[in-house]
Amino acid sequence: MSGFDEEVLDTLRPALGGAVGHLGDGTAVFVRHALEGERVRVRINERTAKFARGDALEILSAHPGRVKAPCPHAGLDRCGGCDLQHADEATQVAWKARVASDQLRRLGGVEHEVEVISVGEARGSRSRLRCLVDNEGRLALRRVRRHDPEVLTTCWLLDERAQIAFSTRWPRGAEVEIRALGEGEPFAVVRLPGRPTEIRDLEGRVLHPDTVSRVDLDSHVFTVSPDSFWQSHHLAPEVLSDRVVEAWREAPGARVVDLYSGVGLFAHALERAGASEVVTLESSPSAVRDARENLRGRRGVKVLARRVEPRTLAPVLREGDVVVCDPPRTGLARGVAQALGQAGVARVVYVSCDGATLARDIRALSQVGYVPRSLESFDLFPLTEHLEFVAVLDRG
C-alpha cells in the first residue's frame, strides 16, 4: 500500500485496537498493533477533524510484554480476527483492564478499576468460528480495512478437532460457521443466500438437517441447535453460570426473570441451585425450542417465546424479582432499563460481552434507581480486545 502519510511517535496509553499517541500537529492517533509506551513508525490510514487512525509499521522501541504472534495469519493488513496477538498474557490482561475501566468511566459514569480474571489456556479454547468462503472454496476471515480476505490454513484459538475444516473446499460465496460444542463431532453450518441452510461434517459431507450439538454441563446434556446461541469459549458456560448463581444467592428475592435467555443455560443453573420460580424470555425460535427441551420437567421454570421490550416485560416482572440478562452485543433494547425500574425489581445481574454497551446500560439503570454493587470481567476472548462482564446492580 502506498500514498499514506507516515510518522514516528510515542504511544501514551492503551486504546481500543492498540494504543493512542499524538502526531506532530497534536492530533490524537489510534495506532493498531501498538502497545503503551512504545516508539513506533505509524502509517496514517484515516484522518477526521478530531483524530486519526493508523497502523504500527515498525516498532522502534518495544514494550517488554511484546511477543511474536503465535498465529501465522496475524500481522499488519492480515487477519482481523485477533487484536492482541503481539502481547503476552499479562500485558493483554493489563491492557483490557485499562480500556474497560476507561469505558465504564466515560460512558457509564462508573469509577471502577476493572480486574480481569484469566480463564484457562487460550489455544484451542474457542468452540465456534464464523468464516466466509473465497472464490476457490477456502475458508477465510476479513482483513482489516481490506476487501480481499485472509485465507486460513489454521486458527490458533479454534478447538483442535475442528482444524480439518481448513483443508476442505466449501461452496463459494457461502458463510460457514464451524461448531465444536461439547464432546460430540464438530460440524459446519453452511449458509448461502437464497438456499436452505445445510449442515455438513468438516470434510464437507452433508448431514441430516436436524443435526444438533449436545453439551454436557453440570451433569446435564444441553441441546443446542445450529441457529441457537452458545458461548464461544469452552469454559464460558460454567464460569458465567457459577457467577450468576452466586449473585442470585446474595439477593433478597427468590423469583428470577431470565431475559435473552437463549437455550436455558442460566435458567438450568438457577433452578438447580434452588430458585423456586424462573421465567425466561427469548425471541429466537430455535433457542426457545432448545430451552423447552433442556428445561423439560422443571416445574418451577416457565419458558416464554417473547422479544425483550417494555410491553412484554410489564405482565412478567414483579417487585422484588431478580432479573438476569445476557443481551446481544448491542445491549438492552430501548426502554428495558426503564421497565425494570418501574417494576421495582430488586437486583439486576447483567452479563455482557461489550464494555461500551454495558457502560451505557449501567448509566440507564442508575438513572432509574439502581446502584452498581460489583463488576467482574473474565478473559473469555483471549488474544482479542473483548471481555465478558458480569455486573450486579441493586435497587438503591
Language-model region placement:
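Accessory RNA-recognition modules of RNA-modification enzymes
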Residues: 1-325, 330-338
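Short loop segments at secondary-structure junctions
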Residues: 136, 394-396
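S-adenosylmethionine
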Residues: 304-389, 394
